[in-house]
């Protein structure tokens, strides 16, 4: 199975399945001498882990990360960092009824078409459980970016169903179970989630992630444009069906005179481009959005077939998120951090001696 690695100089390779013994990853390219402990990684893992609120899956995994290699006496050595998280709350019996049935909207059908077999227990490798290791690896990148470059990466929920959320207060994001930055909409989200749980249904969501303090010059045209790599990273997250950079699809309705980010001696006057021009960071905030589909793991009966081609009706049992977008916030932050870390190392490798007299803001 290919496709388990992302990055060129900062490389993250993950392994493991939803109901296997453990999840793990190898992180290559971390510079030596960076203070690093398991506690540095645990904060973001706790933000992502299941069972932390009544609105997410009640699978209770502590997600305690272990550093197996690459750190000596509290600092990175420059060698591969091995990370491991044990699975402790699997209930594989919940999935015995779907051993021969393809859940509609899931990867069951496509995995079996590709490999000739599948791990039906919680989706196996296709499960969002895999993203725990992305968050752990991303926490390393976030620490390096913050301490060495002053880069801050933040994410939040900006829409659930037909409820749009304004970014009014970043400090509020960590104070409610929805990662919601809009104090006026929390009650509406709560009401929607309670209704969905009662109906046994689910809902889609939009997540926004923002990086501040990113220097100008990151990105490798033409095929490794910074926005292309960000889109690739975010699209690789489970349930993501669309990614926008900056104003995204809204630019369709704009004229060139409206969309261009004009520049004065005081800097850029707008940021429709989301901080990236020509595939290279401009020094402005990098802004990306991603749309997540409603999970298909619901108790509303649906039609499908089994592996023998027979039509059946099924209800998905188990412990699932009514809105997968909620726990996707720290995952999006991690993936953006991984991409920025990789591009910073690539920029330093090729263009460390480049100096310009062009203004920077």
From Swiss-Prot:
| A GO molecular-function annotation | FMN binding
Entry EC number(s): 4.2.3.5
Annotated metabolic or biological route of this protein: Metabolic intermediate biosynthesis; chorismate biosynthesis; chorismate from D-erythrose 4-phosphate and phosphoenolpyruvate: step 7/7
Q: What GO biological process, any one, is recorded here?
A: amino acid biosynthetic process
What does the entry comment about cofactor binding? Reduced FMN (FMNH(2)).
Provide the binding site for FMN: 125-127, 238-239, 278, 293-297, 319
UniProt catalytic activity: 5-O-(1-carboxyvinyl)-3-phosphoshikimate = chorismate + phosphate
Extent of the signal sequence:
none
SUPFAM superfamilies given in the database record: Chorismate synthase, AroC
Q: Name one GO cellular component term.
A: cytosol
Query: Which superkingdom does the taxonomy of this entry point to?
Result: Bacteria
The enzyme's first-digit EC class, named in words, is lyase
Cofactor(s) in the UniProt record:
FMNH2
Q: Which residues bind NADP(+)?
A: 48, 54
The protein's UniProt keywords, in alphabetical order, are:
Amino-acid biosynthesis, Aromatic amino acid biosynthesis, FAD, Flavoprotein, FMN, Lyase, NADP
Q: What does this protein do?
A: This reaction introduces a second double bond into the aromatic ring system.
Family in the record? Belongs to the chorismate synthase family.
Among NCBIfam families, the record links this protein to: aroC, PRK05382.1
Protein name listed in UniProt: Chorismate synthase
Species of origin: Escherichia coli (strain 55989 / EAEC)
């Amino acid at each position: 199975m290919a496709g388990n690695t992302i990055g060129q100089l900062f490389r993250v390779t993950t392994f493991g399945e939803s109901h296997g013994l453990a999840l793990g990853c190898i992180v290559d390219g971390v510079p030596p001498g960076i203070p690093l402990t398991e506690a540095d990684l645990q904060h973001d893992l706790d933000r992502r882990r299941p069972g932390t609120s009544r609105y997410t899956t009640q699978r209770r995994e502590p997600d305690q990360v272990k550093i197996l290699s690459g750190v000596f006496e509290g600092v990175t050595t420059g060698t591969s960092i091995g990370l491991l998280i044990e699975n402790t709350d699997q209930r594989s019996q919940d999935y015995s009824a779907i051993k021969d049935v393809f859940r509609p909207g899931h990867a069951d059908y496509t995995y079996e078409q590709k490999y000739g077999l599948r791990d039906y227990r919680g989706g196996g490798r296709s499960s969002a459980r895999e993203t725990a290791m992305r968050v752990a690896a991303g926490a390393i990148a976030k620490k390096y970016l913050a301490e060495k470059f002053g880069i801050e990466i933040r994410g939040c929920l900006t829409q659930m169903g037909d409820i749009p959320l304004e970014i009014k207060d970043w400090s509020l994001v960590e104070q409610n179970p929805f990662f919601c930055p809009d104090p006026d909409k929390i009650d509406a989200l709560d009401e929607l989630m309670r209704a969905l749980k009662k109906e046994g249904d689910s809902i889609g969501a939009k997540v926004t992630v923002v990086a501040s303090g990113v220097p100008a010059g990151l990105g490798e045209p033409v095929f490794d444009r910074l926005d292309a790599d960000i889109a690739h990273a975010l699209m690789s997250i489970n349930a993501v069906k669309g990614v926008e950079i900056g104003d995204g699809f809204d630019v369709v309705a704009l004229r060139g005179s409206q969309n261009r980010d004009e520049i004065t001696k005081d800097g850029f006057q707008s940021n429709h481009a989301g901080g990236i021009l020509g595939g290279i960071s401009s020094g402005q905030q990098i802004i990306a959005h991603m749309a997540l589909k409603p999970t298909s793991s619901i108790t509303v009966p649906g039609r499908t077939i089994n592996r023998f081609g027979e039509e059946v009706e099924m209800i998905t049992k188990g412990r699932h998120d009514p809105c997968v977008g909620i726990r996707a916030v720290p995952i999006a932050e991690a993936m953006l951090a991984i991409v920025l870390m990789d591009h910073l190392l690539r920029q330093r490798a090729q263009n460390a001696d480049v100096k310009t007299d062009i203004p920077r803001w």
